[in-house]
Amino acid sequence: GLVSDWELFDNMDGRSRALTMIESVEAIIKFWDDKDTYNYKGEFLDISLTKNVLSELGIGKFIKPFQKPYPEIAVSLKNPNSMTAKLAGEKGWIPISGNFVNAQDIATHWPTYKEAAQEIGKNPSYDKWRVGRSVLITSSDNEAKEILDDPMGVFTNYFLYLNSVSKLASGTAGNDINLQNEIPDAMKKAKDLIIVGSEQTVTEKLIHFIDTVGPFGTLLLTGHDVGEKKQLWKNSFSTMSNKIQPILNDYIKQKF
């Protein structure tokens, strides 16, 4: 959640938030399994629902998934050597590396996940790993440069938001954040982390990205505010799916 959520629920401690998340998942799974009553008591959560139940009207009953035992659980990863990646490996959850994370940090996610899984006798395939990235294929590299150089552009605004949220969360800035002063850093982040350019350039950048982070099963393309460039984005997704994806699939199979 956002730092504003942390304050709202009086939970500013990162460790307790992480453990509460784990307990929340455990409680949900338990409720999916339980037939009639719902009880869960952990270090951070104490949940009970036994009295105010009227099954005929669906009151006090949780909807249970059709998929058994339950749908796969996925978690997002950000930090290098992420403890969440370790937890996901132990639990068999789907790891998803964030699109706003640099490639060097992402490169630590799968090894951390795999090592944790192997410690309990599992041998996961990298096909399970999903990696997020912001990708835009333009008609030319010059068009890509114009988009990245726009101080009010979609990618600048995206990282302006993320950078500001991160500063609030770190506690180093308080509420004193001058958004105008944050624009240069947001533009730099966009240029560092967004994969944008002509079809050939994007293909080359994605291959370099794979060389850095290692093989993965799914590339998740991040959605952005398309604004007046709806057709550009539609063309980009189409080119990515029909032309570039097969190249990347072949590259991973041949190299790894």
Regions found by a protein language model. Name each.
Residues 1-256:
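Active-site-adjacent structural elements that line small-molecule/cofactor binding pockets in enzymes
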